[in-house]
């Protein structure tokens, strides 16, 4: 699949403008539309996303997730998404990378109802995703490192790194969607963590950023467990 994420994300208002911006195939768009339909149905009984974000679902959630795809190498096969909630960004990425040989998304979420929802989306869309109903700390114990580790609006960086570090290997890329206050979070995180970081403006949120992290470890050279 050819994936092009370009500036102008705030112009995305529906599935067609999303498709025009990202250049996804018709088949991929149909799978994302199935995801949208299931989310709107389940949202009536489970708080998967904030109700206020539903009118802008394609920008606030679909595009916000999709922008991560172009930030990782095509060799990435094992992607771990922490605190997946309603499936953002992990399920969107799994749908977008459905045709990549050997790709598998691991969705880590402790809320059982949200996990049931994500499994249903994966079943309907054929997304290569495994849902783990477990706390992040428990999943990280003994788990294989990911090629990519991601999270969206999960926790401040100093705490988030405590969960993510055990899942980092020498080549792991961390992708974290952050809002305002990123610089303050980075300053605090550097008091406890060693890492290389770069960030770029979010394509979906004028006030947001995508943080890309490599080489995450504690000051003793080993991943922390908190």
Curated annotation (Swiss-Prot):
GO terms for molecular function: rRNA (guanine-N7-)-methyltransferase activity. It is an enzyme of class 2 (transferase). SUPFAM superfamilies: S-adenosyl-L-methionine-dependent methyltransferases. Residues 199-226 are annotated as: Disordered. Keywords: Cytoplasm, Methyltransferase, rRNA processing, S-adenosyl-L-methionine, Transferase. S-adenosyl-L-methionine binds at residues 83, 88, 136-137, 152. It is found in: Cytoplasm. PANTHER family: S-ADENOSYL-L-METHIONINE-DEPENDENT METHYLTRANSFERASES SUPERFAMILY PROTEIN (PTHR31760:SF0). Belongs to the methyltransferase superfamily. RNA methyltransferase RsmG family. HAMAP family: 16SrRNA_methyltr_G (MF_00074). This is Ribosomal RNA small subunit methyltransferase G. It comes from Parvibaculum lavamentivorans (strain DS-1 / DSM 13023 / NCIMB 13966).
